[in-house]
A protein has these predicted regions:
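Single conserved hydrophobic/aromatic residue that forms the stacking wall/gate
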Residues: 1-13
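Central helical "cap/lid" subdomain
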Residues: 11-53
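Short glycine-/acidic-enriched loop or helix-start segments at secondary-structure transitions
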Residues: 27-29, 54, 93, 154-155
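Short Gly/Pro-enriched turn/cap motifs at secondary-structure boundaries
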Residues: 32-37, 61-64, 123-125
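Short, solvent-exposed loop/turn segments at the edges of secondary structure
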Residues: 38, 66-68, 130
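Conserved hydrophobic/aromatic beta-strand scaffold that supports enzyme active sites
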Residues: 42-44, 72, 134
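Conserved FAD-binding catalytic core of PHBH/FMO-like flavoproteins
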Residues: 48-81
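C-terminal catalytic lobe of FAD-dependent flavoproteins
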Residues: 83, 87, 91-93, 98-209
Length: 212
């Protein structure tokens, strides 16, 4: 965002980057209503021996499944399993999310049940209704990108490139393509949007369980 301030002796122009993502907290309702903050956690095991490594990811691939609340995982350079995916919306049940992440890991790889979790971290991410990133402009001078819906590591670099090219060259075809995506507001307003999302998400998880 470019801002202007007059001091009487001249004009000062500044370029600002405001980093909020899931933490907008009323800063800009026009785009805040298009995202929902939710919690996600990642666990990291103790180092795994080579025999175990060969039974889980012998080619050291990075994996992401197609569940509504997707699981994603890979081996670190220190041969630990890094596994994430449990999503919560209450913003309160942190311990429950940590345990659910470990249960998901054990379900995918039963051979890791007895391996210790040494590190856990997490926080808020921003999701959109259609799970597609929301990238665009406000007032012709504010570029924004958020709502990566759990794919931020991959998409934020692409979004940064799209926005930087827009700043330098003006609105590009890539930016216009994202602006054509009609992102819906989360239903329910401030009072009911969270209960509605929790209910819908529970239904989606059941569909994941039964492979519907």
């Amino acid at each position: 965002r470019e801002s202007e301030r007059s001091r009487g002796l001249g004009d000062v122009y500044k370029r600002q980057a405001v980093c909020c993502n899931a933490y907008l907290d009323g800063l800009e309702l026009g785009i805040e209503n298009k995202i929902m903050p939710c919690e996600t956690y990642i666990v990291c095991t103790e180092p795994l021996d080579e025999a175990i490594q060969n039974t889980i990811l012998p080619n050291n691939y990075c994996v992401s499944d197609t569940n509504f609340d997707l699981n994603y995982y890979r081996l670190s350079s220190s041969k630990r399993m890094i596994f994430g995916g449990a999503v919560g919306y209450s913003l309160k049940n942190v311990e429950g999310l940590k345990k659910r992440t470990k249960r998901q890991l054990d379900k995918v790889y039963p051979q890791l049940v007895n391996h210790k979790i040494e590190y856990i971290w997490g926080g808020l991410i921003a999701i959109t209704v259609n799970r597609v990133p929301d990238i665009g402009m406000l007032n012709d001078n504010i570029y924004y990108a958020h709502g990566f819906s759990g794919h931020g590591v991959a998409f934020t670099g692409i979004a940064g490139k799209i926005i930087s090219e827009g700043i330098v060259n003006g609105k590009t075809s890539e930016l216009e393509a994202f602006e054509k995506i009609k992102h819906k507001n989360f239903p329910g307003g401030r009072l009911f949007r969270m209960p509605l999302l929790v209910t819908i998400s529970a239904m989606q998880r059941m569909m994941d369980v039964f492979n519907v």
